[in-house]
Amino acid sequence: MLKDGRETGKWIRVMTAHRMNLHLVSDATGETLNSIARATVSQFEHAQIIYHRWSLIRTRFQLHRVLEGIEAEPGPVLSTLIEPGLRSELENFCSRIGIAVVHVLDPVLSLLQHHIGEQAIARPGRQYVLDADYFRRIDAMHFVLAHDDGQAQVGINEADLCLVGVSRSSKTPTSFYLANRGVKAANIPLVPGLPEPPGLEAPIVPVIGLTIDPEALIEIRRHRLKLIGGQPNVQQNTAYVDLESVKAELIWARRLCARKGWPVIDVTRRSIEETAATVLQLVEAWHERRRSLPPGG
């Protein structure tokens, strides 16, 4: 909402926040809706969204609680309900009280049904069945725990990829995010003055470097020192958080990656999700190059 206001004798335009209830109704965990809602709401800088999350809604009794909540706190409804009877009751109720409802999976389901030539089975929570993908994610998580921060380097060639970088360059959170997608990611710290980690001497998996702006890295490291009980006023002049030392450390790591032919991702302004997506693109490119090599090349 825009309002006019006066400041130093001039008219200015002031943007005020718009408050809105948003109901997320799911017959499973609600993870899909949460992701969609976050992605869309993030495009509105001045919105103040009050989320009402309704998960595991699979019976009429459970749905009636939702309808009472929507009536008490009116606002648009996003739904991933599959069962036709529940969908119809939700739609009719929202229509009566003038509330918009969107079944967010419908456009994708319609598209796939048309191209596949098969009707969707309409069963809630199918993405959470304990299938091979589920167990692959669990296996990847165990792998990351065993190979985090340079541990068990002898097993690096069992990984799908290896992340390298200086301390606090987001190797660990990126590895765990990838594990949640079923990707086994080892990660090894690069430390100036120490011998090259043995796991990196002749890796047969893609190795990807992570780097970061020195000022941002120093801020992360200072925060880390606070969390582990360090005293920033004493530690701030050490090499760990000294600007020139950190710059030299990052340059050294970049040169090592360049010498080894490892691609480098700057994570300074990237979310973990964006970094992971770029990592997977680089891994795919690595495999494409390998496939294009002649036998024995």
Curated annotation (Swiss-Prot):
Catalytic activity from the UniProt record: N(tele)-phospho-L-histidyl/L-threonyl-[pyruvate, phosphate dikinase] + ADP = N(tele)-phospho-L-histidyl/O-phospho-L-threonyl-[pyruvate, phosphate dikinase] + AMP + H(+); N(tele)-phospho-L-histidyl/O-phospho-L-threonyl-[pyruvate, phosphate dikinase] + phosphate + H(+) = N(tele)-phospho-L-histidyl/L-threonyl-[pyruvate, phosphate dikinase] + diphosphate
A UniProt-annotated Pfam family: Kinase-PPPase
Binding-site residues, ADP: G165, V166, S167, R168, S169, S170, K171, T172
Keywords, sorted A to Z: Kinase, Nucleotide-binding, Serine/threonine-protein kinase, Transferase
Job of this protein: Bifunctional serine/threonine kinase and phosphorylase involved in the regulation of the pyruvate, phosphate dikinase (PPDK) by catalyzing its phosphorylation/dephosphorylation.
HAMAP family: PDRP
Homology family: Belongs to the pyruvate, phosphate/water dikinase regulatory protein family. PDRP subfamily.
Protein name according to UniProt: Putative pyruvate, phosphate dikinase regulatory protein
Lineage: Bacteria, Pseudomonadati, Pseudomonadota, Alphaproteobacteria, Acetobacterales
